[in-house]
Amino acid sequence: IIKPAVPVLTTVEHPEALNVIMETAEKAGARLVCSPDQISWRYNPGEVKLGTLLPSKVKAFTHGREWPEFELSLLGPHQASNASLVLACVHELQQQGIAIPQEAIKYGLANTQWLARMEVFGKSPLVVLDCAHNRASAKVLVNTLGSSFPKGPKTLLFGVSVDKDIKGMFAEFGQFFEKVLFTQSLYSPRAAKPEDLAHLWSQVSQKPSYSEPILEKAMAMALETTPPDGILCVTGSVFLAGEVRSILPNYLPV
C-alpha cells in the first residue's frame, strides 16, 4: 500500500504497528505524517437523549494547523481520531492544489452514515446496533455507551463467531451490562452456539444470561425484558448486526 514519494498518514499509536509503518515508509521514501506529533485532537462526546443524537464534536490539529471545531455524526472517541485523519488528508490534498471548501468538509463530517456502527433505533428502550467483534472494539463500545447514552438498565444481545476473543470481549462487558441474552446468526457458518457462550459467560460473570438460538425470538425476548428507560445493545458480529437490522422494524413502533 505504501508507495514511493506518496505521503503516508496515520493515527495509529500502538508502538509495534507504528514502528512497522515507519520502517516501511522510510524504505519506500514516503513522507510520514502521524500522531501525536503531527495529528492530534480534542473530543467533545455527543449525547443521545430520547432517541435524538446531539452530535459529538472534534477539534483537530494537523501539520501545525488548527482546524475549526466540527460536528460528527458518528459517536465515539475513535471517530474523532478518524475525523482528524480525514482532515490531515484534506490538508495534503489542498497542498497539491485540490480545492476542498470548508463547507464540504463540514457537511461530510456531520452527515457521514455508517450502518451498524453505534446506530440508534427506538426510544423506549433505546436500541443500539454495533459490529464490535474483538476486545478493543468491545472496550470502545462500552466506553461510548457510558459517556454518550442515558444512565439506566443495560441489556446485551450478543452473537459472535467461534474464532473471536470471546473471553476478552466478556471481560469488557461483564461489569457494564445487567443481563445478557445469547443468540446466533443464521447466515454465519462460524457462529458460536448460544449455550456455549452462556457457559463461557458464567466463568467471567455472575450476572444472569439466557440463550435463544432463533434470532427473532431472542430479539423479542431482549426487548420485552429491557425496561423502557433502558438500553438494549446488539453486537458481536457483522452477520448478526445485518440480520437484526433487517428485522428490527418489525419490533419497533412506527
Task: Give names to the regions the model predicted.
Residues T11-V33, L126-L129, R135, F170-I231:
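C-terminal helical cap/extension that packs against the catalytic core
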Residues A17-L18, L240-G242:
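Short, active-site-adjacent cap segments at secondary-structure transitions
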Residues S237:
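Active-site-proximal loop/hinge segments that shape catalytic or ion-binding/gating pockets
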Residues I1-E69, L87-K106:
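Acidic, Mg2+-coordinating active-site environments of NTP-dependent enzymes
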Residues V58-K179:
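Nucleotide phosphate-binding/pyrophosphate-handling subdomain across enzymes
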